């Protein structure tokens, strides 16, 4: 189990070449308009992503792939849930990069697929509890956004880590719930986050791809 956890941690590390640092998931737009101005705003925004936004939808996709569900319906759901062109490119391109690198590291090859589906598909072979896989994915997802927010708002590094730690209870609860949630119950409801992701496509001055 230790070896399996190390491998999953490697795959979800910021150093793994999926260019996660290039995506803000609409945060850059929300910060530029003043919707997110401090650590408290950031925490509330990320909580919404985690409980009703794309983050929790990704958690379902990771869980179902890790549990061995057919991958094609999961890939179709991932594309359908991407609310904008940039959101689709975010999950598609990171997934392709993840698959390309893990194909060189693993005995079996996967075809390109959306990022959460690819992570879940690879994690299935590790034999880890599905809830644990989901929890680590959610933490990595949110950690990447916090890193971007620290630079954009800006926040101090300590404030960023405080936000991250404040999310742990919700991550734990969500991971347990999402581990058994069927694909038929997947969905998103973080409307402001989706609108920010759409508006980012026409933002004139920007650093991040999404």
UniProtKB/Swiss-Prot annotation:
<keyword id="KW-0143">Chaperone</keyword>
<comment type="similarity">
    <text>Belongs to the UreF family.</text>
</comment>
<dbReference type="Pfam" id="PF01730">
    <property type="entry name" value="UreF"/>
</dbReference>
<keyword id="KW-0963">Cytoplasm</keyword>
<dbReference type="InterPro" id="IPR002639">
    <property type="entry name" value="UreF"/>
</dbReference>
<protein>
    <recommendedName>
        <fullName>Urease accessory protein UreF</fullName>
    </recommendedName>
</protein>
<comment type="function">
    <text>Required for maturation of urease via the functional incorporation of the urease nickel metallocenter.</text>
</comment>
<keyword id="KW-0996">Nickel insertion</keyword>
<dbReference type="InterPro" id="IPR038277">
    <property type="entry name" value="UreF_sf"/>
</dbReference>
<dbReference type="GO" id="GO:0005737">
    <property type="term" value="C:cytoplasm"/>
</dbReference>
<comment type="subunit">
    <text>UreD, UreF and UreG form a complex that acts as a GTP-hydrolysis-dependent molecular chaperone, activating the urease apoprotein by helping to assemble the nickel containing metallocenter of UreC. The UreE protein probably delivers the nickel.</text>
</comment>
<dbReference type="GO" id="GO:0016151">
    <property type="term" value="F:nickel cation binding"/>
</dbReference>
């Amino acid at each position: 189990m230790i070896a399996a956890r190390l491998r999953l941690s490697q795959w979800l590390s910021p150093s793994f070449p999926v260019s996660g640092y290039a995506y803000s998931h609409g945060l850059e737009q929300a910060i530029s308009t003043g919707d997110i101005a401090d650590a408290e705003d950031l925490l509330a925004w990320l909580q919404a992503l985690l409980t009703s936004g794309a983050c929790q939808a990704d958690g379902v996709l990771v869980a179902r792939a890790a549990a061995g569900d057919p991958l094609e319906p999961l890939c179709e759901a991932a594309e359908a849930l991407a609310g904008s062109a940039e959101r689709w490119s975010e999950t598609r391109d990171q997934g392709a990069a993840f698959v390309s690198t893990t194909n060189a590291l693993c005995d079996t090859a996967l075809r390109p697929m959306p990022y959460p589906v690819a992570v879940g598909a690879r994690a299935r072979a590790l034999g880890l509890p599905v809830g644990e896989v989901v929890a680590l994915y959610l933490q990595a997802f949110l950690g990447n956004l916090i890193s971007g927010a620290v630079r954009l708002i800006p926040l101090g590094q300590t404030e960023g880590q405080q936000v991250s730690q404040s999310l742990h209870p919700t991550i734990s609860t969500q991971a347990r719930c999402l581990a058994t949630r069927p694909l038929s119950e997947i969905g998103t409801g973080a409307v402001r986050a989706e609108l920010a992701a759409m508006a980012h496509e026409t933002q004139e001055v920007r650093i991040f791809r999404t």
